[in-house]
């Protein structure tokens, strides 16, 4: 066992040769490297698979022996300071390593087909492999300096992948937004690291925790300064894990390729913030104020992310806000001190969310045959619907991921989310009410995404549903706005007018007109990007199922979604593998070793949580299930529903909720108005002050010197009369001064 731990340092470096060799090959032998691009993809998967096997071996040994291993190399600079580098293998490291490698392998296999049409295929795999290396280095770090180095590398890789299609202005802006937002958190993280080094004199986790606990117990530190340093450390996690108020970069990050969205949301960048807080829990646990602050930020993010997901038309952005809300649950659990449930939910959510993102990528991939390589169209749920007939495997996998995230047993997220919800009652009834109500919101918006995507009819064609009359009652979204229209002399079809807008621009359920799309209109829909040699060979008016290379990872993730939750079933300690796995960490956090519960208590809590989820699903089905397609005469329904005061009031509430959700809670607008515009005005004022004041003073002195010199030069023109005039003038002035001084 000791020998296995000694070679654990190789874990972060195994995937590293792939990006290095790809870069070297593209520099020296570009043609040969591009012709062998599938070989590089295979090597990426192979090396990451070796890391996964290594991580599994370490995890099995830790489950059996509950051991922690650390090895460091000391770089002595002088007698007062030493910088150490090494690696730490503990339950948290092994959990994160398995999570990164398993999800990473699935994403790499999936990407081979998904990115096959793209000229940046090799660049994508180089970034992905380096991303895995950076994240593995982060989770195996033994001190705060290494954490910060790999933290920045993880951020760099995410920026490169978010802006992968950098020729698209939207993707470039999304990359810049992610960079600037994370700069705020990373600067706070750096200040926090330096602050705790100033307090304890060490970067190593073990020494840091031990020294700090001794200082706290002896009351030898300033509590205000310690809390400030802890908040600065936590600021890094807020930005990385998209917690309020530094969450604004996450939905825009969907401009990157879908596979990287799956990796970022499941096992890498957003998980890094949760990992950092979990790693520093022994530090935070002795600072009560910071624990309360962590839980407060978590509960705000839980509710905020869920409400912002209600009105999204983009399938990936809806899933992004879902990730934000679920990360809030994890942060809430960590703030409550529920270490086990937070990591449990991190595991279950990772596989469920990876399944959902890869499923959405399969949907987008199939929609591109109809609307082309245009994210605004291929990711728009308003144009989808009825896909269950065309992509049945993707539909079933997406449904399983949806039900898991909704908290339906026995799927993975049910077990972990239920633990967090139950623990919230013990911590704060107010937090518990918000957390439980948000569980209903989660079920609602996830079911909404599923229904808009797979149920009903294929709305990109938008034919009448009954076959006899145009039926405008089946309107896609209570929350959706009218999109852009296609204008053409021969095209009398509005591509996304699925909700008829009234005079004030609000969505209306009842309209008098429905526009149909003829064959000429369908033929006009072409890809906005035509890539030679990589164009789709299949052309169809309907979507089709993805290739086996994309379906295989989805099927594997289905197995994880079905069975990974059983790792932490709390009925019996003998089968509770997760508790055995986390035994050292649980003891460190002063948690009880008895994690088993009785059947009655579990069933009582489970029935309540499942009932809330079912209520959210029911509301979603009531609003979005295409039950109206069977009605042939809509005048009957229009005559029943009348515009009364109650209807007007309910419409105002719906519109207010829609505006809040669709406009991202106005946080982006607030930042744009006060921060972005404020910084620009400050820059303009600084520019004015620099040019007119700072530069104006020396320029003015120079100008005055030039003017005086010109005057003196004109005086010394060589005329004797001028010299005599100035001579007598100066003598007269001096005599007058002398006279007045002697009065």
From Swiss-Prot:
- GO BP annotations listed: ATP synthesis coupled electron transport
Q: Where in the cell is it found?
A: Plastid, Chloroplast thylakoid membrane
Annotated TM spans: 9-29, 40-60, 89-109, 125-145, 147-167, 185-205, 224-244, 258-278, 284-304, 327-347, 354-374, 396-416, 425-445, 551-571, 607-627, 723-743
Q: What is its EC number?
A: 7.1.1.-
Instruction: Please give one Gene Ontology molecular function term for this protein.
Output: NADH dehydrogenase (ubiquinone) activity
The enzyme class is translocase
Naming one, the record's GO cellular component terms include:
chloroplast thylakoid membrane
The record's section on InterPro entries has: NADH_UbQ_OxRdtase_chlpt_su5_C (IPR002128), NADHpl_OxRdtase_5_subgr (IPR018393), ND/Mrp_TM (IPR001750), NU5C-like (IPR003945), Proton_antipo_N (IPR001516)
The reaction(s) annotated as catalysed by this protein in its Swiss-Prot or TrEMBL entry are: a plastoquinone + NADH + (n+1) H(+)(in) = a plastoquinol + NAD(+) + n H(+)(out); a plastoquinone + NADPH + (n+1) H(+)(in) = a plastoquinol + NADP(+) + n H(+)(out)
Annotated membrane topology: Multi-pass membrane protein
Oligomer and partners: NDH is composed of at least 16 different subunits, 5 of which are encoded in the nucleus.
The cross-references to NCBIfam families, in alphabetical order and at most eight, read:
NDH_I_L, PRK06590.1
Q: Which family does it belong to?
A: Belongs to the complex I subunit 5 family.
Role of this protein: NDH shuttles electrons from NAD(P)H:plastoquinone, via FMN and iron-sulfur (Fe-S) centers, to quinones in the photosynthetic chain and possibly in a chloroplast respiratory chain. The immediate electron acceptor for the enzyme in this species is believed to be plastoquinone. Couples the redox reaction to proton translocation, and thus conserves the redox energy in a proton gradient.
Q: What is this protein called?
A: NAD(P)H-quinone oxidoreductase subunit 5, chloroplastic
Give the organism, scientific name. Answer: Helianthus annuus (Common sunflower)
């Amino acid at each position: 066992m000791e020998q296995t731990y000694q070679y654990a340092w190789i874990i972060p470096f195994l995937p590293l040769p792939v990006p290095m060799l790809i870069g070297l090959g593209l520099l020296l032998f570009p043609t040969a490297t591009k012709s062998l691009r599938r070989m590089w993809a295979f090597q990426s998967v192979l090396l990451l698979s070796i890391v996964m096997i290594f991580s599994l071996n370490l995890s099995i040994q830790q489950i059996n022996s509950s051991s922690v291993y650390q090895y460091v190399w000391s770089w002595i600079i002088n007698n007062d300071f030493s910088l150490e580098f090494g690696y730490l293998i503990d339950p948290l490291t092994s959990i994160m390593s398995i999570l990164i490698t398993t999800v990473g392998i699935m994403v790499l296999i999936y990407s081979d087909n998904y990115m096959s049409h793209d000229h940046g295929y090799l660049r994508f795999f180089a970034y992905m492999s380096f991303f895995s290396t950076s994240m593995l280095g982060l989770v195996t770090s033994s001190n705060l300096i290494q954490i910060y180095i790999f933290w920045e590398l993880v951020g760099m890789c995410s920026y490169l992948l978010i802006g992968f299609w950098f020729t698209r202005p939207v993707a470039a802006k999304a990359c810049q937004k992610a960079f600037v937002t994370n700069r705020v958190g990373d600067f706070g993280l750096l200040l926090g690291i330096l602050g705790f080094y100033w307090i304890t004199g060490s970067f190593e986790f073990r020494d840091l925790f031990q020294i700090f606990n001794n200082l706290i117990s002896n009351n030898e530190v300033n509590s205000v300064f310690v809390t400030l340093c802890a908040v600065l450390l936590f600021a890094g996690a807020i930005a990385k894990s998209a917690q309020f108020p530094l969450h604004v970069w996450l939905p825009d990050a969907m401009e990157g390729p879908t596979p990287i969205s799956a990796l970022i949301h499941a096992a890498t960048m957003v998980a890094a913030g949760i990992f950092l807080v979990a790693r520093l829990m022994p530090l935070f646990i002795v600072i009560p104020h910071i624990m309360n602050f962590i839980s407060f930020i978590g509960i705000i993010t839980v509710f905020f992310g869920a409400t912002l997901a209600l009105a999204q038309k983009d399938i990936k952005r809806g899933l992004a806000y879902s990730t934000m809300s679920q990360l809030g649950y994890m942060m809430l659990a960590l703030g409550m001190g529920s270490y086990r449930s937070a990591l449990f939910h991190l595991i279950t959510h990772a596989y469920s969310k990876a399944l959902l993102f890869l499923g959405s990528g399969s949907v987008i991939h199939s929609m591109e045959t109809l609307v082309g390589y245009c994210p605004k169209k291929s990711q728009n749920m308003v144009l989808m619907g009825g896909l269950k007939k065309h992509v049945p495997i993707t539909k079933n996998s997406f449904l399983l991921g949806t039900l898991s995230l909704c908290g339906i047993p026995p799927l993975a997220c049910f077990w972990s989310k239920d633990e967090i919800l139950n623990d919230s009652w013990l911590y704060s009834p107010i937090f518990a009410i918000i957390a439980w109500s948000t569980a209903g919101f989660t079920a609602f918006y996830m079911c909404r995404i599923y229904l808009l995507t797979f149920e009903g009819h294929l709305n990109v064609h938008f034919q009448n549903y009954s076959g006899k009359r145009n039926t405008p009652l089946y309107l896609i979204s209570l929350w959706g706005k009218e999109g852009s229209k296609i204008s053409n002399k021969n095209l009398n079809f509005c591509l996304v007018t699925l909700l008829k807008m009234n005079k004030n621009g609000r969505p209306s359920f009842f309209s008098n007109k429905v526009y149909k799309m003829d064959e000429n209109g369908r033929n006009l829909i072409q890809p906005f990007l035509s890539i030679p040699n990589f164009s789709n060979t299949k052309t169809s008016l309907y979507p089709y199922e993805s290739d086996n290379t994309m379906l295989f990872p989805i099927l594997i993730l289905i197995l994880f979604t079905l069975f990974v939750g059983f790792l932490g079933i709390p009925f019996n300690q003998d089968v509770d593998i997760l508790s055995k796995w986390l035994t050292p960490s649980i003891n460190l956090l002063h948690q009880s070793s008895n994690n088993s519960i009785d059947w009655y208590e579990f069933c009582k809590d489970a029935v309540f949580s499942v009932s809330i989820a079912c209520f959210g699903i029911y509301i979603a089905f009531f609003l979005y299930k295409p039950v109206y397609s069977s009605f042939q005469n809509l005048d009957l329904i229009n005559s029943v529903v009348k515009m009364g005061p109650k209807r007007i009031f309910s419409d105002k509430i719906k519109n207010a909720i829609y505006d809040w959700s669709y406009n991202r809670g106005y946080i982006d607008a607030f930042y744009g108005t006060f921060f972005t515009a404020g910084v620009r005005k400050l820059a303009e004022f600084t520019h004015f002050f620099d040019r007119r004041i700072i530069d104006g003073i020396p320029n003015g002195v120079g100008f005055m010197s030039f003017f005086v010199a010109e005057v003196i030069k004109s005086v010394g023109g060589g005329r004797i009369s001028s010299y005599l005039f100035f001579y007598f003038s100066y003598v007269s002035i001096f005599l007058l001064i002398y006279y007045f001084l002697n009065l």
